[in-house]
Amino acid sequence: MGVSDRYMVKWFLGSDANGIYAVAYKIPTILTILAAVFLDAWQLSAIAESDGDRQAHLRFFGRIWDAFASAVFLGAGGIIALSPLLIRLLAEEAYYDAWRYIPVLTLSMAAAAFSNFLGSVYVVTKRSAASFWTSLSGAGTNIVLNLWLIPRMGIQEAAVATFASCLVVFLIRLVNARQLLPFPLSGRKLAIGVTALLVQTLFLLFRWPGWVLAQLAGLAVLLLLGLPALLSTLRVILYRKQANV
């Protein structure tokens, strides 16, 4: 989706706008890369665990999802909060305005990471066709929204189109993948995490009064929300390692 975004930004808005968008896109991609490294290793474990007791497998899947989602939320919240500073440190001064597009693109990368985790369900259940058509639905949404929004509203709308398309894929997979493998997933935690990221994004972009406090509050909520799952999963991993020694 990122390739089509940049192509259309360049087509409609010119090379300068495309350069700013490309710089903004690079920082949230850190989240995607780290998630991809984890998911490559996770899929092997998910396949191996699928040969055992189904209920134990579902609990294992749910536990890993909880920890993964917590880590993604915390990573995304940190990138959003620090986006003006990150651009100042990592990009030339001419590209400083690129920070304005990082928060929405970070939301996109978080949604993409969640979609990729749910894609591991298709690997375990050998439903690769479902992975293809859900990805295709997101690509189609992205192209349509880019064609509609970018000429009218500019660079930020390319980021919005990317977020919307990643969200479409995630929501479709959330329903479809959990029909195939109904692992435990807390809708309440998911809603709280998404709300915290949206609050951070809106306060930062519009510089509403208390925007700094909103970043700190959002990160605190995400930490309180995710820390128990992260610590619990870490204990399980350490226990398994000790048991295998």
Language model features with spans:
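Small-residue hotspots at the loop-to-helix junctions and early N-terminal turns
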Residues: 13-26, 98-103, 159
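Membrane-proximal transmembrane or re-entrant/amphipathic helices at the cytosolic face
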Residues: 202-245
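Membrane-interface helix-loop junctions in multi-pass transport and translocation proteins
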Residues: 16, 129, 136-171, 175, ...
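Helix-loop junctions and terminal segments of transmembrane helices
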Residues: 28-65, 119-124
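Membrane-interface junctions at transmembrane-helix termini in multi-pass inner-membrane proteins
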Residues: 106-137, 177-179
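Alpha-helical transmembrane segments of multi-pass membrane transport and lipid-handling proteins
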Residues: 35-38, 61-112, 143-151
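Residue-level recognition of pore/gate-forming positions within transmembrane alpha-helices
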Residues: 26-29, 76, 109, 135-140, ...
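Alpha-helical transmembrane segments of polytopic membrane transporters and translocases
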Residues: 5-7, 19-35, 65-67, 108, ...
